[in-house]
């Protein structure tokens, strides 16, 4: 049985940890509001850009000399998984869920006879994937060098991916990233970004719009921007998901610390009471012996 001194030390240690988790919870809650607003504000832009892309793509569909980013390499053999993880921990099961989704996609592609490589964004997802796919890491981008990764970082990632695509390093690229629902729910989703998938929005396709200077010229400009926008959206969703998961995890940790403090306090009081009772019995026994 632990001594009173040891129990007191454990109680103080858990109280110190509780203060840290409570502070982290409050910081994450403050950051979440800003991150959630940014992620939600970017969604309409991405949606509208996809509609414009659909309208343009419908006009140039079937052309053999169309943009490479839309028609692809003509092969479906080499697949690149762009996995977007966080740079920091203490955010519950967010990163493990993203890694699980990436490995699930990789196994499905390999079962179909495809070749799979990875492009890693974020520090926390590197070790598990490197361990299982030591020779399957094509490249990566370190977003931990900036406090809050934004459009510039998304553009740099997109530029490197496009360079790899044009160099013939892969045929299809999929983006594996978290999608923020709320503070309790962040779901990993997989989206094809290269080549740009065919549009499914019939409203956008049926719209009668005349483009100047021409559909192909505009597509050549918009396709890289579309890839950048998808990555930028993933970074925003990642930030909101990270703060939401962190707030929830730290709230659970704070509650668990409180429960542990209560249990240790009860144990401490019982041990103290037992020690006092033992001393009284010894004193009474000694007095009776006299």
UniProtKB/Swiss-Prot annotation:
CDD domains in the cross-refs: F1-ATPase_gamma
Annotated localization: Cell inner membrane
One Gene Ontology term, aspect cellular component: proton-transporting ATP synthase complex
Stretches that traverse the bilayer: none
Topological category with respect to the lipid bilayer: Peripheral membrane protein
Gene Ontology MF term list: ATP binding; proton-transporting ATP synthase activity, rotational mechanism
Gene3D superfamilies the UniProt entry points to: 3.40.1380.10, ATP synthase, gamma subunit, helix hairpin domain
One protein family per Pfam: ATP-synt
Family per similarity comment: Belongs to the ATPase gamma chain family.
Cross-referenced NCBIfam families: ATPsyn_F1gamma, PRK05621.1-4
Subunit structure and binding partners: F-type ATPases have 2 components, CF(1) - the catalytic core - and CF(0) - the membrane proton channel. CF(1) has five subunits: alpha(3), beta(3), gamma(1), delta(1), epsilon(1). CF(0) has three main subunits: a, b and c.
Stored HAMAP family: ATP_synth_gamma_bact
Protein name: ATP synthase gamma chain
């Amino acid at each position: 049985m632990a001594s009173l001194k040891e129990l007191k030390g454990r109680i103080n240690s858990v109280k110190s940890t509780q203060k840290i988790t409570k502070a982290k919870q409050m910081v994450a809650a403050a950051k979440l509001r800003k991150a959630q607003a940014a992620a939600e504000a970017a969604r309409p832009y991405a949606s509208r850009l996809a509609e414009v892309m659909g309208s343009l793509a419908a006009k140039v569909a079937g052309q053999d000399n169309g943009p490479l980013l839309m028609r692809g390499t003509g092969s479906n053999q080499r697949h690149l998984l762009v996995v977007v993880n966080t740079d920091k921990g203490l955010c519950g099961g967010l990163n493990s869920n993203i890694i699980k989704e990436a490995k699930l996609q990789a196994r499905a592609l390999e079962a179909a006879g495809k070749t799979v490589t990875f492009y890693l964004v974020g520090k926390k997802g590197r070790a598990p994937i490197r361990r299982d796919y030591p020779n399957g890491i094509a490249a990566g981008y370190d977003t931990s060098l900036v406090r809050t990764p934004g459009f510039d970082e998304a553009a740099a990632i997109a530029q490197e991916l496009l360079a790899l695509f044009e160099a013939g390093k892969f045929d299809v690229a999929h983006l594996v990233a978290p999608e923020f629902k709320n503070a309790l729910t962040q779901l990993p989703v997989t989206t094809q970004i290269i080549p740009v998938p065919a549009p499914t929005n019939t409203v956008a396709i049926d719209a009668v719009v005349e483009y100047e200077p021409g559909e192909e010229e505009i597509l050549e400009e918009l396709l890289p921007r579309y890839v950048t926008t998808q990555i930028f959206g993933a970074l925003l969703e990642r930030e909101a998901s990270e703060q939401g998961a962190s707030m929830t995890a730290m709230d659970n940790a704070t509650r668990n610390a409180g429960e542990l403090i209560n249990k240790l306090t009860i144990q401490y009081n019982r041990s103290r009471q037992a020690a006092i009772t033992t001393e009284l019995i010894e004193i009474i026994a000694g007095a009776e012996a006299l």
